[in-house]
Amino acid sequence: NASEYGIPYDAPPIVRRESIEVAPGRRVSFLVWGEGEPEYVFLHGGGQNAHTWDTVALALGRPLVAIDLPGHGHSDDVADPSRLSPQDNAADVAHVVRAVAPNAKVIVGMSLGGLTTIALAAHAPELVRRAVIVDVTPGVNSDKSKAISDFIRGPATFPSFEELLARTIEHNSTRTVESLRRGILHNAFQLEDGSWMWRYRRFPGGGVVGGVVTATEHPNWAPLWDLLGANTAPVLLVRGMRVQSVVDDADVAELMRRRPDAVVIEVVEAGHSVQGDTPVELAEMIRDFAAR
């Protein structure tokens, strides 16, 4: 990652995986970057995992925590898939943040992670001193997220890694093949029969649990607008401007109506996955926002 984006480093980064129990018999896993008290907490999008932030973490070069949301990555699943909403996620994330990053300067969330950040600020406002929301608002709907849901609703398993990679390339035209290959190796695993499967829980109908897609219809995240409007923590919205973005002008207008103090940055070269398309630039935005 560092070589691809020209990030200088003298030695391999210090990264370790840990987990804590958030409910009896259920654990949430996370990556701890660097030494010392974490300054940032990162929450990924639906169908992703903590490694989506690897390049951003390298560019920041500061102690931080990147969490695998429930039902994603190496975190345990939940028995009831309806219990993976942003509000449910926020309760689990609060356990982790209190335990390992209680003094984090900024919580950064992308897509599902962004909605979870909004919910976290309402659930545990003392943990969210500043919030960076990456390409999502409570105004997301099925039309805005169609390109993403089309990808997520694809096959659950693939006969070979090459076929999985080919589908991923088809739906992520802004990313390099090598970056997508690395991402898949963190977000999929090989079954005993040699086929490959995504490392996240899926709805029976083919959507991704807790993300912007359900088996039958799009969740209504509009109530999160009220939570966002009531919170007083400084907010930065990073909006991708390419076609896969799920934020439109009406969403930005609604954000500014409810939070006139919010900061909005438009990233021309990024789609929905700003951390994948322009990770170094995103890291700089986060660093600058934390210093305000």
For the regions a protein language model found, what residue spans apply to each?
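Conserved serine/cysteine hydrolase catalytic core
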Residues: 191-258, 263-266
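Conserved hydrolase catalytic core segment
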Residues: 102-142
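Active-site glycine-rich loops that stabilize anionic/oxyanionic intermediates
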Residues: 37, 45-48, 111, 241
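Helix-rich cap/lid subdomain of alpha/beta-hydrolase
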Residues: 139-203, 216
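Alpha/beta-hydrolase fold catalytic core
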Residues: 1-38, 61-62, 101-103, 263, ...
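Serine-hydrolase catalytic-loop signature spanning alpha/beta hydrolases and amidase-signature enzymes
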Residues: 45-55, 64
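Active-site loop/oxyanion-hole signature of alpha/beta-hydrolase fold enzymes
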Residues: 23-26, 31, 55-58, 65, ...
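Catalytic histidine-centered segment of alpha/beta-hydrolase-like enzymes
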Residues: 270-279
